[in-house]
UniProtKB/Swiss-Prot annotation:
Bacitracin is thought to be involved in the inhibition of peptidoglycan synthesis by sequestering undecaprenyl diphosphate, thereby reducing the pool of lipid carrier available. GO terms for cellular component: plasma membrane. PANTHER family: UNDECAPRENYL-DIPHOSPHATASE (PTHR30622:SF4). The keyword Transferase does not apply. Catalyzes the dephosphorylation of undecaprenyl diphosphate (UPP). Confers resistance to bacitracin. SUPFAM superfamilies: Proton glutamate symport protein (SSF118215). The chain crosses the membrane at residues 4-24, 40-60, 74-94, 101-121, 134-154, 174-194, 201-221, 228-248. Signal peptide: none annotated. It comes from the Bacteria. This is Undecaprenyl-diphosphatase. The gene is uppP. One of its GO terms (molecular function) is symporter activity. Belongs to the UppP family. Its EC number is 3.6.1.27.
Length: 248
């Protein structure tokens, strides 16, 4: 049952901007399950499959653009790569620091508050840019936001959506770009960590639950992003921050 709960938490919190890693760590503590970074990474791979389904149209469009040698699509891929670099470098250089943060609920509590603030401000931001209109500097800025999302308590979807809106992307485009740029990072981290674990029926069930609940949460996030109702999650993150602070 605990593995089903963790899979459900991962799927719902990975895309809803409330930090899946922060919730997994907190609930592992509450349910007396020893935090396992490798198992968490495997669940991230399960939700990665949900991302691919969600942005499948954009992925196909990009691939067609590359095969037909359209310059703007090569430029878009380069921007996505640029957005990926900061998190990759930071994760490689400070891997031990990142892993240690998973055991400190006080730190996680602070990061939940960072997520809450970014979501509250996001509802007030407006943008008109498409994928092809952002600059390489814009892509780097969004990537820097993704970099700090490595820490538990900071929502990757929430903070990168905030970054994309900050540089002027239209709301739905900002959401889609957030997930497109997340694919390489989640895939890399997942492969790196899952090589350390042995697959069993429990973790596979967790992965399936994470995938299905992830698809549901993506649809919810899309609707709330467009309707500018992300502050709902901001209030929730403040509540979780308080709980994590006193539990820790």
């Amino acid at each position: 049952m605990n593995h089903i709960v963790l899979g459900l938490i991962q799927g719902l919190t990975e895309f809803l901007p409330i930090s899946s890693s922060g919730h997994l760590t907190l609930f592992s503590y509450l349910f007396n399950i020893e935090p396992n970074i490798s198992n968490f990474a495997f669940l991230h791979l399960a939700t990665l499959a949900a991302i691919i389904v969600f942005v499948w149209k954009e992925i196909v469009e990009i691939l067609k653009g590359l095969f037909t040698l359209k310059k703007e699509y090569y430029s878009l891929v380069l921007k996505i790569i640029i957005s990926t670099i900061p998190a990759a470098i930071f994760g490689f250089l400070f891997n031990s620091t990142i892993e240690n943060s998973f055991s400190n609920l006080k730190i996680i509590s602070f990061f939940f508050l960072v997520t809450a603030a970014s979501l509250f401000v996001s509802d007030k931001l407006k943008g008109k840019k498409d994928f092809f209109n952002i600059s390489y500097i814009d892509a780097l800025i969004i990537g820097l936001f993704q970099m700090i999302a490595i820490f538990p308590g900071i929502s990757r979807s929430g903070i990168t959506l905030f970054g994309a809106l900050t540089v002027g992307l239209e709301r739905e485009k900002a959401l889609k770009y957030s997930f497109l740029m997340g694919i390489p990072v989640i895939l890399g981290a997942g492969i790196l960590e899952t090589s350390k674990i042995e697959l069993n029926s429990y973790i596979l069930i967790s992965g399936l639950v994470a995938f299905l609940s992830g698809l549901l949460s993506l649809l919810i996030l899309k609707k709330l992003t467009i309707s500018k109702k992300l502050k709902i999650f901001s209030y929730y993150c403040i509540l979780i921050a308080i709980i994590a602070f006193f539990v820790g």
